[in-house]
């Protein structure tokens, strides 16, 4: 009798039933109790469920069974057709709901949450910030309602064969690569405002999709295969303000039926280009005098010299208001998108001769991305403002962050030390290096001839053999030239500058040339954009020389004499000539110029210079290898990385003891 009273109380407090027991509302006040609140008799005919309260992994495991799928993804008898979670929240817990998958955050719909579930309509919790990867993979859903400001990860909606309607919120955060894939019944995608649409097939392989429409403000849309494999797509329409687009001839891929792309609102900046292999494509359509910055020959921008109509200024104000109305997102993409948009507003303000706008956006960029502002203000479109005190003051303030040669000139000087410091060593007799020399056939690669020619040939060989890939993951192998070479060949991959430099250092050491890979960093603490190059000792020149396998680059003086990094730094400071080899390049796809590579990139990254004291293969496979590094800094400069520091440049560039 007591047990019956308990069940009655639970149903009275937590469950509201229709006469047929098909529609149920449950308030899960204690995570993990959902199953207790839905007795077997209620579950049997349940088709519509509205949940409030907090759900943990155990609740989600049970919920999946109501949607016809078990813990191991086999089919079970579940009839649920509508699930309303709008007032529910997720509760981080250790209980697995599918295999080993758990609810790991209160604001993230976890991976595989609805995997293969059979439910007609889902209304997601309002508190969600992210729909994680594969959350709806292979789910038999027809309609899903997304919460405000949510972002969608890759493959979140992958291979959902019945999906007909995605009800987007008033403002979407980010739509990642491959977010909506293989949804064959989807015919129209209508988004409202959206912060960021990624390239790489954010909407892909939806065989019946005919129209993509964005009705609110668009923050940024990438320009590489953003929409792909959409054989029936005929139209893309932007009905609201567009703040930024990428662009290339491959911004769309395999969309053969596409006829037109329409901008029905103002456009701050676009680089959309003509699209290859679209036999039915007519053109881009945009409003006259409402595209402010265009890098596209297909979309006409406003003339830099004017004249401008009131409609143009009205459109610009609309873009400003749209940007300011964007909410704060719980998304890493917001910083990137905001930075690009502020840069665009700065340039557009200059073109419109809007000094107040220019100063406003310049100050915002100075706060958020100070390094960028100086290079932006050096563009010729700002020439008309030069000599005006407030503009000059802004530019001068930005100089200390973005004029890298000026930063070197004003940096603290080095100072000689009388103290005895640990010597740099070179492991010429390492058995690993002997193997590297033999199996990579380095003597054949270096060839005959003078020393400098041999040094260059080895650098060029590595540059050609393995591409530079700055975004690649760290390799899962021993960090010696032979294992890294094999790993790259077997996995058809490239390496970032660090591993290319480590490989080249091993090759030089194997051939008997003293060498170190050195990490060059900027003044800005936490700047991830450092660069790693090699310095190798030349007996002929009796000094170190600069070799960079990432860009097949070396630096000389005006007479063609090779320089080492310290000499390059000195010449940047005192203004003496520097020459970059004319064949310096990135993966044979784009050339590098002296202005780009030396004056900007390396000038930024020669503020501090770091090297290992012990130079041998696999040094960075070792735990606590940072204890073996020493960083050259100006006197009084605080370096927050690992290892020791020195301000004695003579010590840092000391000649090696030759074998």
Feature map (PLM): residue ranges:
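Secondary-structure boundary elements
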Residues: 404-495
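Leucine-rich solenoid repeat scaffolds
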Residues: 202, 247-300, 375-395
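Hydrophobic/aromatic-rich core segments of domains that either
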Residues: 502-577
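Alpha-helical and coiled-coil interaction segments, frequently adjacent to or embedded
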Residues: 565-659
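Alpha-helical protein-protein interaction modules
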Residues: 294-388
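Structural signature of tandem-repeat unit edges
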Residues: 23-29, 47-55, 76-107, 117-130, ...
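Hydrophobic h-region of N-terminal signal peptides that target proteins for export
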Residues: 11-20
């Amino acid at each position: 009798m007591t047990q019956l009273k308990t069940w009655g109380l639970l149903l009275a407090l937590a469950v509201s039933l229709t006469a047929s027991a098909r529609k149920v509302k449950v308030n899960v006040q204690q995570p993990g109790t959902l199953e207790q609140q839905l007795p077997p008799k209620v579950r049997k005919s349940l088709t519509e469920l509205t949940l409030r309260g907090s759900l943990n992994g155990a609740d989600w495991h049970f919920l999946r069974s109501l949607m016809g799928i078990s813990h191991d993804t086999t089919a079970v008898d579940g009839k649920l057709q509508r699930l309303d979670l709008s007032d529910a929240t997720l509760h981080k817990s250790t209980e697995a709901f599918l295999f080993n998958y758990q609810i790991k955050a209160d604001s993230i719909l976890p991976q595989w949450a609805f995997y293969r579930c059979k439910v007609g309509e889902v209304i997601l919790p309002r508190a969600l910030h992210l729909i994680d990867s594969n959350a709806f993979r292979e789910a038999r859903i027809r309609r899903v309602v997304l919460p405000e400001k949510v972002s969608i990860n890759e493959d979140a909606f992958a291979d959902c064969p019945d999906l007909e309607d995605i009800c987007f919120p008033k403002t979407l955060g980010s739509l990642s690569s491959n977010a909506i894939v293989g949804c064959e019944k989807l015919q129209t995608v209508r988004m409202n405002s959206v912060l960021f649409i990624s390239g790489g097939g954010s909407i892909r392989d939806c065989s019946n999709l005919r129209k993509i429409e964005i009705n609110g403000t668009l923050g940024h849309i990438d320009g590489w295969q953003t929409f792909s494999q959409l054989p029936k797509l005929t139209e893309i329409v932007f009905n609201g303000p567009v703040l930024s687009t990428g662009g290339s001839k491959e911004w769309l891929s395999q969309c053969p039926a596409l006829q037109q792309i329409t901008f029905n609102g103002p456009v701050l900046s676009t680089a959309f280009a003509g699209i290859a292999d679209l036999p039915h494509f007519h053109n881009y359509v945009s409003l006259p005098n409402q595209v402010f910055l265009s890098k596209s020959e297909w979309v006409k921008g406003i003339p830099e010299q004017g004249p401008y109509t009131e409609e143009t200024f009205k459109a610009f104000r609309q873009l400003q208001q749209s940007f300011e109305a964007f909410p704060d997102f719980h998304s890493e993409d917001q910083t990137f998108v905001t930075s690009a948009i502020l840069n665009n507003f700065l340039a557009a303000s200059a073109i419109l001769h809007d000094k107040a706008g220019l100063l406003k956006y310049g100050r915002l960029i100075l706060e958020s991305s100070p390094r960028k502002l100086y290079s932006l203000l050096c563009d010729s479109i700002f020439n008309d403002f030069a000599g005006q005190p407030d503009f000059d003051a802004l530019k001068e303030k930005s100089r200390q962050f973005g004029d890298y040669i000026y930063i070197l000139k004003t940096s603290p000087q080095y100072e000689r030390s009388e103290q005895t410091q640990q010597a740099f060593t070179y492991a010429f007799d390492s058995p690993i290096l002997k193997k590297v020399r033999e199996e990579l056939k380095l003597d054949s690669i270096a060839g005959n001839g003078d020393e400098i020619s041999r040094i260059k040939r080895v650098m060029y060989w590595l540059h050609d053999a393995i591409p530079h890939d700055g975004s690649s993951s760290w390799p899962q192998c021993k960090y010696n030239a032979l294992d890294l070479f094999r790993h790259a060949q077997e996995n058809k991959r490239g390496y970032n500058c660090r591993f290319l430099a480590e490989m080249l250092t091993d090759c030089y050491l194997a051939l008997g040339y003293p060498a170190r890979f050195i990490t060059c960093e900027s003044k800005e603490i936490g700047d991830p954009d450092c660069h790693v190059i090699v310095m190798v000792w030349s007996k002929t020149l009796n000094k170190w020389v600069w070799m960079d396998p990432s860009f097949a680059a070396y630096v000389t003086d005006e007479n063609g004499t090779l320089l080492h990094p310290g000499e390059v730094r000195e010449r940047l400071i005192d203004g003496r000539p520097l020459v970059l080899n004319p064949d310096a390049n990135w993966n044979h796809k784009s050339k590098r110029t002296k202005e780009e590579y030396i004056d900007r990139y390396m000038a930024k990254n020669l503020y501090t210079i770091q090297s290992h004291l012990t130079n041998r293969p696999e040094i960075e496979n070792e735990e606590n290898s940072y204890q073996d590094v020493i960083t050259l800094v100006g006197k009084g400069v605080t370096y927050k990385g690992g290892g020791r520091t020195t301000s004695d440049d003579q010590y840092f560039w000391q000649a090696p003891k030759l074998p």
